[in-house]
Amino acid sequence: MERAIQGNDAREQANSERWDGGSGSSTSPFQLPDESPSWTEWRLHNDETNSNQDNPLGFKESWGFGKVVFKRYLRYERTETSLHRVLGSWTGDSVNYAASRFFGVNQIGCTYSIRFRGVSVTISGGSRTLQHLCEMAIRSKQELLQLTPVEVESNVSRGCPEGVETFEEESE
C-alpha cells in the first residue's frame, strides 16, 4: 500500500527506508544493489526549506507484481558511463523471472515506476502483457534520464528524443 508523503515526512522516509536493499535476492528484478544516500548525504544535497525536492544524487525506480513491490534508489551522475550503468539495473529476463514467482492461474497487475528530479513516470499492465510493459519501461527510463540537462561538459551531441519532431519557423 502506498502512502502520500508530504513536507518533512519525505526526509524522514528517505532516512528510514532502504528501498529493498541488496542485490542478492533470488526474486528481485534488479541486478544492482540499492544505493540510497545516507542521512548526512541527504541533508547535504537537499534544500531544508523545500523538503519535497528530489535528491539530485540519483533516482528511484520500482517494479510491482500484484501486492509485492521491489524498489531501488540508484546513483546517477548524468554522464554517458553512469547512464549505461543504470540502464542495466534490470533486464527483461530478470523482470520476467521475478514476476513469474508471483504469477498464479489468474492475471496480476504489473507496474513499473521511475522518479527523477521531480518527474514521475508509471506504466501498468497485466501479467500477460509483461514483455510489452518491459519494452515501454526501458524506453521511458532512457528518455527520462537522457532528457535531463547535462551538468558536466560532454562532447556527446544529444539529438531529439524518439517521437519528438522539431519545426522551424518560416520567415515571412
From Swiss-Prot:
Single biological process term from Gene Ontology: symbiont-mediated suppression of host innate immune response
Biased composition (Basic and acidic residues): 1-20
Pfam families named among the record's database cross-references: Tombus_P19
Gene Ontology cellular component annotations, sorted alphabetically: virion component
Molecular function in Gene Ontology: RNA binding
Keyword RNA-binding: yes
Protein name, UniProt field: RNA silencing suppressor p19
Species, as recorded: Tomato bushy stunt virus (strain type) (TBSV)
Source organism phylogeny: Viruses, Riboviria, Orthornavirae, Kitrinoviricota, Tolucaviricetes
